[in-house]
């Protein structure tokens, strides 16, 4: 498809979002060339909301709006896929959420970053990241100005990879984006054909979306980068927004199917690899193993290289840096990191001595135990959300099957044993 010069196809999947109209207005107001913007929007709406009404844009030829009644919505990845069907040959594409803010001339700045990277011999750069935050109740004063990058956090029990944002080190001295291992669905700017080549799998629900797109983009020949300056802001708290799962009683089934689809894509936890060759699978420019070498993640073992743990930029030491592939694999560590949420109502006593905190594998064998002492318990009891967040991290070659929290009270002795499957 011939690309329309300098145009940007903006992808927005919005679910009952009071920030949608403000996001659109701020984007257009701060674009240097607003005439080059084409907005594809999947507006998932409730008839009684009103705050996301887009009627004033419907005669504007730059807008392609798909209205979906909230009861027909199937999740964010499904909605993003709907938007991608509206692509029509624009030169660039920007995927964002419906709660964002923009710096002046953001459009030409992003295009310049792409062109600067192409001049360095990178044909398909992709700019992405967990961009810095803003506060709708204190904007623009509440905007974080430092640019952020994404670093590895953990493999969650269901198999998806989680990331954390942090400030890009030395960003003030940078004049070009920095390499990234990961992809963020709330900010991605790249060549327009990305909307056709790496479409969101509508069978994904939420978690797993970003790591699967990162790998698929890489195998399609895209090189991932974080912008070295802040041009776009994101609202992270979800305060005042109804989420799709709030309205969908079957969201749990969708979520479980999504996690299974993701594990099959990567062949994790003994699952037979499926989906890697289809329309929502991997590209032909690079392989999954190429991504694992680049990123320092080994999906089949839920393992990670120290280079990635240390937050060093990719590429990681690859197979060619070792005697053989076996030695390269041995350079990975399987680290299990998990947060156990224990509601205050499950631990009502006031005189706990300690809590047993343990993780068990096959045949109920204990893989790891580190008890919570009185200081940790008292600290957790201050959580404003009403949950004790029991974080544990440990090396293990075997994925735990379940956890146990077993409180001991000075006056009552052993209390109710609390367990949860993983």
Q: Where in this protein do the model-derived segments appear?
A:
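Terminal low-complexity segments of carbohydrate-biosynthetic enzymes
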Residues: 139-140, 162-175, 179-189, 241-422
């Amino acid at each position: 498809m011939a690309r329309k010069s300098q145009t940007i196809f903006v992808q927005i999947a919005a679910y009952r979002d009071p920030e949608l109209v403000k996001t659109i207005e701020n984007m257009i107001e701060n674009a240097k060339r607003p005439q080059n913007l084409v907005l594809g929007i999947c507006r998932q709406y409730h008839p009684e909301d009103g705050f996301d009404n887009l009627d004033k844009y419907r005669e504007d030829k730059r807008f392609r709006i798909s209205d979906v009644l909230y009861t027909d919505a199937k999740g964010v990845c499904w909605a993003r896929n709907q938007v991608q069907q509206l692509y029509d040959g624009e030169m660039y594409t920007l995927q964002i959420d419906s709660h964002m803010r923009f710096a002046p001339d953001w459009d030409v700045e992003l295009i310049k970053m792409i062109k600067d990277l192409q001049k360095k011999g990178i044909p398909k750069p992709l700019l992405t990241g967990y961009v810095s935050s803003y506060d709708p109740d204190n904007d623009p004063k509440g905007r974080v100005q430092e640019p952020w990058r994404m670093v590895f956090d953990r493999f969650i029990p269901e198999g998806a990879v989680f990331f954390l944002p942090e400030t890009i080190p030395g960003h003030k001295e940078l004049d070009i984006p920095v390499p990234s291992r990961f992809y963020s669905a709330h900010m991605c700017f790249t060549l327009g054909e990305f909307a056709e080549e790496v479409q969101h799998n509508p069978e994904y629900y939420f978690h797993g979306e970003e790591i699967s797109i990162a790998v698929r983009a890489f195998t399609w020949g895209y090189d991932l980068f974080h912008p070295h300056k802040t041009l776009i802001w994101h609202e992270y708290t979800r305060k005042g927004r109804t989420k799709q799962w709030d309205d969908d009683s079957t969201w749990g089934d969708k979520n479980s199917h999504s996690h299974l689809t993701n594990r099959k894509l990567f062949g994790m936890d003994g699952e037979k690899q499926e989906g890697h060759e289809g329309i929502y699978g991997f590209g032909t420019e690079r392989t999954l193993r190429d991504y694992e070498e680049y990123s320092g993640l080994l999906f089949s073992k839920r393992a990670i290289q120290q280079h990635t743990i240390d937050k060093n930029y990719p590429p990681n030491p690859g197979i060619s840096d070792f005697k053989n592939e076996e030695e390269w694999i041995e350079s990975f560590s399987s680290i299990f990191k998990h947060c156990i949420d224990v509601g205050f109502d499950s631990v009502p006593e006031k005189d706990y001595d300690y809590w047993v905190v343990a993780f068990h594998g096959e045949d109920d064998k204990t893989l790891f135990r580190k008890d919570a002492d009185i200081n940790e318990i008292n600290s957790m009891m201050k959580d404003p959300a009403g949950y004790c967040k029991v974080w544990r991290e440990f090396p293990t070659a075997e994925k735990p099957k379940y956890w146990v929290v077993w409180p001991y009270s000075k006056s009552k002795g052993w209390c109710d044993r609390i367990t949860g499957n993983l």
